[in-house]
Amino acid sequence: MSDTTKMELFTARVCPYAHRTRLVLLEKGLDFELIEVDLQNKPERFLQVSAYGKVPALVHDGVEIYESAIINEYLDEVFPEPSLMPRDPRLRAQARIWIDYCDGHFLSDHYAALKNQDQAKNAAWKDKIDAHLRRIDQGMRDLSPDGPYWLGPSASLLDFAYYPFFERLPAWAHYRDLGLPDDCTRIRGWLTVMAERPSVRAIANPPDYYIERYARYAAAPAAAE
């Protein structure tokens, strides 16, 4: 890659959003420089690229982009092979709806449940997270009953948007008993297939890594801000 098209990804190993974009870059077979950001001591150049001070952030051909969902669509448009979004505009819309559900609903509750310090509310949070997971499971069945991916036989940006959070689920199970309900069999089958993808295997972390890194989230709400 020439200097004019050099690609840099600002990331943090622990971050599920950055994990998404790393998966897409690997799926595309793209060359890029990985810049690990200390989230407790963010470098000035990173803050110049990422207006929100969050990872991931991408620099490519003079363009600075942040927010994982936006970065991933950019990558799929600029580097169209292999395509990670369906050609059917109706399915593309469904993919975006479910990615928005992940970012705007599922994850906000997921992290709130992890940071909850009131044991009297644990059961209510568990019910809420289980409801999210069952909704996701049903959404997978509705879009592609046989899978193995969200939208059918091929992986898409939708799969890579969700997978990093499921890889981190052991931390939620460890601290708040928030695991995958037994009846979410569509998700279980999807996870098995996703875990075997070379891109996923290349950057996977063991459960103990996430349990250790998410301890501060589970300890107290203020510590995780």
Regions found by a protein language model. Give the residues of each.
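Acidic/histidine-enriched, glycine/proline-rich intrinsically disordered or flexible terminal extensions
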Residues: P206-E225
